[in-house]
Amino acid sequence: MYTGSHSISMDPKGRMAIPTRIRDALVESCGGRLVVTAHTEDRCLLVYPEHEWLALLPQIEALPSFNKVSQRVKRILIGYATPLEIDGNGRVLVPPTLRDYANLDKKIMLVGQGKKLELWSEESWLALLNAPAEDEIPGEMLSLSL
């Protein structure tokens, strides 16, 4: 389970060091093999351990092809999906197309989301946290006790 928010740096080549706790968990669960893709609604990236992505992929592929929203989701998730591997220095290289999609620069945030991680530009992450709530709490969340 991946939790926590980590402020990290990305070098000009697009390499970022994975924080030790997260890196160790990723190496243990998937040998450091990841799949990174674009989020369908926010300008951030989704980082999956390879086995989690492979389990999710059939569900994505099964989305109806004649539904425009489903087709858009499939195009983004599968079209941007890129396999990555943690190198010997504990870093991954994020390709330029994905960096551009999420507006990633030097300062980035790696945010745990349970079975996956999200990768945000620090500026976008802080804007999200500071944005006023736009919607009411969905009914299915009302029973959640924090």
From Swiss-Prot:
It comes from the Bacteria. Coiled coil: none annotated. InterPro entries: MraZ, MraZ_C, MraZ_dom, MraZ_N, MraZ_sf, SpoVT-AbrB_dom, SpoVT-AbrB_sf. One of its GO terms (cellular component) is cytoplasm. It is found in: Cytoplasm, Nucleoid. SUPFAM superfamilies: AbrB/MazE/MraZ-like (SSF89447). Keywords: Cytoplasm, DNA-binding, Repeat, Transcription, Transcription regulation. One of its GO terms (molecular function) is DNA-binding transcription factor activity. Its main location: cytoplasm. GO terms for biological process: negative regulation of DNA-templated transcription initiation. The keyword Repeat applies. Residues 5-52, 81-124 form the SpoVT-AbrB domain. Belongs to the MraZ family. Forms oligomers. NCBIfam families: division/cell wall cluster transcriptional repressor MraZ (TIGR00242). This is Transcriptional regulator MraZ. It comes from Cellvibrio japonicus (strain Ueda107) (Pseudomonas fluorescens subsp. cellulosa).
